[in-house]
Amino acid sequence: MVAKILDGKQIAKDYRQGLQDQVEALKEKGFTPKLSVILVGNDGASQSYVRSKKKAAEKIGMISEIVHLEETATEEEVLNELNRLNNDDSVSGILVQVPLPKQVSEQKILEAINPEKDVDGFHPINIGKLYIDEQTFVPCTPLGIMEILKHADIDLEGKNAVVIGRSHIVGQPVSKLLLQKNASVTILHSRSKDMASYLKDADVIVSAVGKPGLVTKDVVKEGAVIIDVGNTPDENGKLKGDVDYDAVKEIAGAITPVPGGVGPLTITMVLNNTLLAEKMRRGIDS
């Protein structure tokens, strides 16, 4: 068996076309979604990622802006800029690029975003809504993972799903989304014992810990679906996933590559959530 390759680039391209159609329909009603991104400092990776988000938003017809503050910006300065965007009626969605400089509290900033404009889905109110199954902004990487599974026509009901990693950004929210699809979910983490026994029984494995080569062929059940969220640069700058891709693809039923798997869907879901934010505040059904 050779796994079906779950091409995130193509899935994202198809999904963005649907978003573009919805943006055009909104414009005909007189509304244009706008994404505002706050970037603090000059970290090269953050700058590149923010530019990618801006370009992607503009490509589907949205307005996008980057609010760039100096590395030395105080927490108060960041909060003031955030408050301005919260109160700007032209802004549909706001995200703050992390990591932030040490003098700025990431949690304090994330909690200051208007929950109705929180397109990253990290505000405590939106996290709470996710866990009581209310409509909300879902963190973008988990949302992208679910779109990949949907696109691949993976039936999750009754399946054993193992999530490696318990972060609030990926591990915990994707576990909740899998539960919503009636999968039986196990979360593994750095303190888990005998991880192999859980993995060998998994129909779906989502790995999101940033440890290259963690998931090997000998712990994967034949036909399992493998979602690799790992994104770690090696000594040559080449991105590596958590999964031993070349070996595991020989036994898995389906697998995401790194790069080109989950990554393209993460930015796509930022756009999805920005569109949702605009629709919700205008009283337009999704």
From Swiss-Prot:
Its EC number is 1.5.1.5, 3.5.4.9. Keywords: Amino-acid biosynthesis, Histidine biosynthesis, Hydrolase, Methionine biosynthesis, Multifunctional enzyme, NADP, One-carbon metabolism, Oxidoreductase, Purine biosynthesis. It comes from the Bacteria. GO terms for molecular function: methenyltetrahydrofolate cyclohydrolase activity; methylenetetrahydrofolate dehydrogenase (NADP+) activity. NADP(+) binds at G165, R166, S167, S190. SUPFAM superfamilies: Aminoacid dehydrogenase-like, N-terminal domain, NAD(P)-binding Rossmann-fold domains. Pathway: One-carbon metabolism; tetrahydrofolate interconversion. One of its GO terms (cellular component) is cytosol. The keyword Repeat does not apply. It catalyses: (6R)-5,10-methylene-5,6,7,8-tetrahydrofolate + NADP(+) = (6R)-5,10-methenyltetrahydrofolate + NADPH; (6R)-5,10-methenyltetrahydrofolate + H2O = (6R)-10-formyltetrahydrofolate + H(+). Coiled coil: none annotated. One of its GO terms (biological process) is methionine biosynthetic process. Homodimer. PANTHER family: C-1-TETRAHYDROFOLATE SYNTHASE, CYTOPLASMIC, C-1-TETRAHYDROFOLATE SYNTHASE, CYTOPLASMIC-RELATED. NCBIfam families: PRK14175.1. This is Bifunctional protein FolD.
